[in-house]
Each structure stands twice: as C-alpha cells, then as structure tokens.
C-alpha cells in the first residue's frame, strides 16, 4: 500500500511528499488522527518543547496536513523515528506520513517506491573540528575519528569522501542527534 510521504531534509535535499492513496486517507479520516513520523528531536524541525509539546518546521507540516485532511491541526500523533526506522515505519503503515530530515535519492524513489515532492530545505555537509587542532582543510583529517548518524546519506557521503581521497577514518556511529 502506498503511503503519503512527507520527508523533510536537513542532510541533503528536502521535503518530499507523495499523493496519499485513498486507503491511507480513509484510514486517517476514520481514525480522526494523522500518525506523523518525525525526527527523535531536532530543534527547529521536530522536538518537544519544555512543556512536552512538539514544535518546529516538520511539526508544522504535520499540522498543516491534519488541518487539510481532518480540519484540525491538533489531530496529530507524533511518532519519533531514527534514520534507520523511518522507512520501515512508513512502509508498514505505522505512520501515515513522514515529515523529517531525509535526502531524496534515486534509490529511495525507485526501490522504496516513495513519491517525492518539491524540495523545501537545502543544506550542506561539513566537518566540525576543534580550532586548537589547527585543521584548515578536510583533507587533513586522514585517520580522524568521526561521529556519524547511522542510516543517513551523510554516512554514505562521508565514506565516499574518504575513499575518493584515499584517506582512512574511524566512524563512531550514533543513532540519533538528540
């Protein structure tokens, strides 16, 4: 069953959405709530505030869809998802839509059969290095230990960068950025 897809990107390209199948819309309307997959906590995009209420850009997208489909922007159940769990949750029906940082790729479009919409957020990737190390170029990072969020295109881009520059690195995988 095809699901509506809203994928907001922080690591690459942007917000993507598919046209919801009639069955998904029927399910949402019958349930009276939209199950919206969001990041596990990315301030400015999707994170609970001090009162425990979700806020941010991706949250606003979920609210807009709930308002359009159900007439109530508060009729949203937020489901925290990691880079590794987001696509399984969408494909399995655990969520009705996904609104979280996700890069649109050919493989995700073709193999996962998600329909992406226009990009809503552009970003970039880089390295943060303590100033006292005196590093002025990423090419000086041969042998570095680098934290990287798993299940992301950033993880793949990091491996590609080091491989193409004949450099080694020690990845420190992290599940979430929270």
Regions found by a protein language model. Name each.
Residues 41, 103-104, 130-134, 146-154:
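Short coil/turn segments
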Residues 52-60, 81-84, 148-153, 174-178:
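Soluble non-cytosolic domains of exported or imported proteins
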Residues 63, 67, 71, 75-140:
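Acidic, polar ligand-binding/catalytic clefts
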Residues 2-12, 20-74:
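N-terminal hydrophobic or amphipathic helices and topogenic motifs
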Residues 50, 63-74, 116, 154-176:
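Ligand-binding cleft/hinge of the Venus flytrap
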Residues 25-26, 87, 138, 178:
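Short hydrophobic/charged patches on amphipathic alpha-helices used for structural packing
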Residues 33-39, 55, 139-155:
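Short loop->beta-strand "edge-of-pocket" segments that line small-molecule binding or catalytic clefts
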Residues 47-53, 76, 86, 143-148:
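Second-shell loop/turn segments in exported
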């Amino acid at each position: 069953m095809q699901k509506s897809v809203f994928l907001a990107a922080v690591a690459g390209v942007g917000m993507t959405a598919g046209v919801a199948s009639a069955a998904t819309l029927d399910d949402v309307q019958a349930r009276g709530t939209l199950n919206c997959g969001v990041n596990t906590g990315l301030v400015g995009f999707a994170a609970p505030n001090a009162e425990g209420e979700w806020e941010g850009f991706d949250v606003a997208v979920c609210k807009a869809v709930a308002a359009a489909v159900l007439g109530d922007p508060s009729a949203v159940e937020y489901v925290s998802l990691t880079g590794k769990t987001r696509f399984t949750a969408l494909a399995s029906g655990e969520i009705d839509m996904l609104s979280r940082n996700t890069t649109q790729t050919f493989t995700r479009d073709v193999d996962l059969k998600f329909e992406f919409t226009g990009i809503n957020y552009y970003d970039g990737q880089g390295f943060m290095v303590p100033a006292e190390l005196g590093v002025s170029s990423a090419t000086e990072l041969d042998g570095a230990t680098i934290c990287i969020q798993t299940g992301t295109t950033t993880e793949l881009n990091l491996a590609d960068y080091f491989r193409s520059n004949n450099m080694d690195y020690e990845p420190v995988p992290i599940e979430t950025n929270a």
